[in-house]
Amino acid sequence: MTLWVLGLNHQTAPMELRERASFVGDALPRALDSLRNLPNVNEAALLSTCNRTELYAETTNAQMLLNWLEQHRPGLQNHLYQYSDAAAVRHLFRVATGLDSMVLGESQILGQVKDSWSMARTHGTLGNTLDRLFQHSFSVAKHARTNTRIGTNPVSIASTAVRLAQDAFSPLNESTVLLIGTGETIQLAAKHLSEGRVQRLLIANRTHAKAQMLASQHGGYALPLTELNLHLAEADIIFSATAAPTPIVTQSNVESALHIRKRKPMLLFDLAIPRDIETEVGTLTDAYLYTIDDLERAVEENRRSRREAAETAEAIIELQVKRYMDTLQAHAHQAPLRRLRTFGTTTRDELLTRARQQLANGRPAGEVLEQLAHGLTNRLLHPPTAALREAALANNTELVRAAEQLFPEKPGYHHPTLQTTIVKTDETDPAS
């Protein structure tokens, strides 16, 4: 059986294709049930997020997995990557650590990998191999994130702005934040702010229904954009990212708000292009304005820091891949060793029981011991001897060389001529 991963992600497929490839809601457990019924597939797990869909499986037939994927999500073949064994292990470790993410080092993916593992366990498609692999990936991700700065600095405009706001108004649970717009940047800011337990969140948008929807998701209050100036003075922090062609927050608006606030400072983040906030706002006393250019410099510094941390994380992963594969190989070798030991102990017990019975029947101890010794020798040595003879005839030097390593010839020692000794007994010894 070989470990395989088949998948696509943001690097190999556009958004519309990733959406079509995903397994969400009830589709995921149904897919796992289908995979469980495939012949020659021992184990399987599905990782499906907005940026990737990946199938992990232990199987002897990778083509069967490709056929299954084509049947359930047609049209993906030209966008798929596939890895096996050590490459598959390395890929999962990189995914769990955030090194394969659209945002380098993001931590959300680790939770999604854990969800994938949990779902596969629940539906009975996870066995020892994938269970051990996924759990090891969790440890690797934790180790990499603990020992590097791969996830410490924000690398999106929105998250960097929120981090600056937290530094300026700590804690946020004593601050009122006003969000203007409901696009992707504002949605991300709202997510980070709600995680920071902001005291009060106001959301203003031209389409009031969209503001209400975003507000309901994060415990905020929706405002029509026409009432924006009525609420400016309430805001300690403002994030704005709309598609307006001209500024919607003017110098005079902010000046009036500062007057009402009795000069209590305001922090403003203009995350829009073209600008939502007049540049003159930055000249006002007690108003601190950050634009995308200001934030981009901080973001690029953070990205550089993460790239440096990623190099260290990659080295950690390479070491962990080697350790994991060594462990896997050791486990693979344990099965024949267990069979060998079982064969030896079973043979010993069987012949020892017979010897005791013969002694109880009054047979001379010397004869019984001699038969026991010869029986053990013949029974234990017959399988390897026959295998070595066949290997020699087939020119299988690998097996012969292994035997030479196990039983090296000592200096001055000469092998006696191979003879078969038959000990006459009251009954025929099946081991002879």
Curated annotation (Swiss-Prot):
GO molecular function: glutamyl-tRNA reductase activity; NADP binding
Enzyme class: oxidoreductase
PROSITE patterns to which the protein is assigned, alphabetical: GLUTR (PS00747)
Site features described as Important for activity, chain residue numbers: 91
Catalytic activity: (S)-4-amino-5-oxopentanoate + tRNA(Glu) + NADP(+) = L-glutamyl-tRNA(Glu) + NADPH + H(+)
Keywords assigned: NADP, Oxidoreductase, Porphyrin biosynthesis
Associated pathway: Porphyrin-containing compound metabolism; protoporphyrin-IX biosynthesis; 5-aminolevulinate from L-glutamyl-tRNA(Glu): step 1/2
Top-level taxon: Bacteria
Annotated positions binding substrate: 49-52, 101, 106-108, 112
Binding locations of NADP(+): 181-186
CDD domains cross-referenced by the UniProt entry: NAD_bind_Glutamyl_tRNA_reduct
Stored Pfam families: GlutR_dimer, GlutR_N, Shikimate_DH
EC numbers: 1.2.1.70
Active-site residues, Swiss-Prot/TrEMBL: 50
Record function comment: Catalyzes the NADPH-dependent reduction of glutamyl-tRNA(Glu) to glutamate 1-semialdehyde (GSA).
Domain notes: Possesses an unusual extended V-shaped dimeric structure with each monomer consisting of three distinct domains arranged along a curved 'spinal' alpha-helix. The N-terminal catalytic domain specifically recognizes the glutamate moiety of the substrate. The second domain is the NADPH-binding domain, and the third C-terminal domain is responsible for dimerization.
Family: Belongs to the glutamyl-tRNA reductase family.
Subunit: Homodimer.
Leftover remarks: During catalysis, the active site Cys acts as a nucleophile attacking the alpha-carbonyl group of tRNA-bound glutamate with the formation of a thioester intermediate between enzyme and glutamate, and the concomitant release of tRNA(Glu). The thioester intermediate is finally reduced by direct hydride transfer from NADPH, to form the product GSA.
Protein name: Glutamyl-tRNA reductase
